[in-house]
Amino acid sequence: CIAPRAEGDLFERICESWAHVPSPEREIGIARDVIVIHMGSQANLFAAMAWTLIFLLARPDVIERIRAGDDGILNPFSHEAIRMTQRSIVLRRVVAPIDFEQGNAIHHLLPGTLVSTMMSVTNTTAAPWLAKFDISNYRGSVFPRSRELAAPELVTTYGHGKHTCPAHRFSTSAITQAISELVRHFDLEPRYKDPHPRPRQLGGVARADRLCKIAYSRR
């Protein structure tokens, strides 16, 4: 059977975002977005959720706020956790001739050239204050401090503009619901020490460089 369509659900929002595009490009775009969401929910979503939990277990004050009903704090919290552990690769198309210096060499890039950039290179280094986890960097899902950077794209979680991940809202909702239920129903105790993103990972949200066990007991 086919489940009834819920008004305003994720699929409906995807369809609306392609409403201005003529057929068959519209249907192709919708299908591709659905595939991206499916792939993300199988891998990167769980990594993002895990890092949110890891950072959260170091902040008992935030856990108590969630237990008191403040689920909204998980929105900026999860975005900051993803910023710190993002390892995605993004292709940038050169739109004007530029000279790119690399050590002693200079590369002349012409319009149309595709350059691969790693979010992890600038997410924590574009400014000194980005090196540490700070929930105040985000207001909800918005990064208001982008005006303090040379370019807003230097810090990325779910992408910018047309490159924004179509699973953004879904992922944030899933993380918020899962983590809030965990901390309300269980006492959690980390059985790991100082995990870091795997240094050689390319693409997606990082996996941890070690096993991260968590002991739990029902509240």
Predicted regions and their residues:
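Cytochrome P450 heme-thiolate monooxygenase catalytic domain
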Residues: 1-20, 171-174, 219
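Central I-helix of cytochrome P450 enzymes
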Residues: 14-68, 175
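Active-site-adjacent bridging/hinge elements
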Residues: 20-27, 144-156
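Conserved cytochrome P450 K-helix E-x-x-R motif and the immediately C-terminal K′/meander segment
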Residues: 68-107, 111, 116-117
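Active/binding-pocket-proximal capping segment
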Residues: 70-71, 98, 129-140, 195-196
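Hydrophobic, well-ordered secondary-structure elements that form the walls
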Residues: 81, 112, 161, 167, ...
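Conserved cytochrome P450 K-helix/beta-meander segment immediately N-terminal to the heme-binding cysteine loop
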Residues: 117-146
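Cytochrome P450 heme-binding "Cys pocket" and the immediately downstream C-terminal segment
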Residues: 170-204
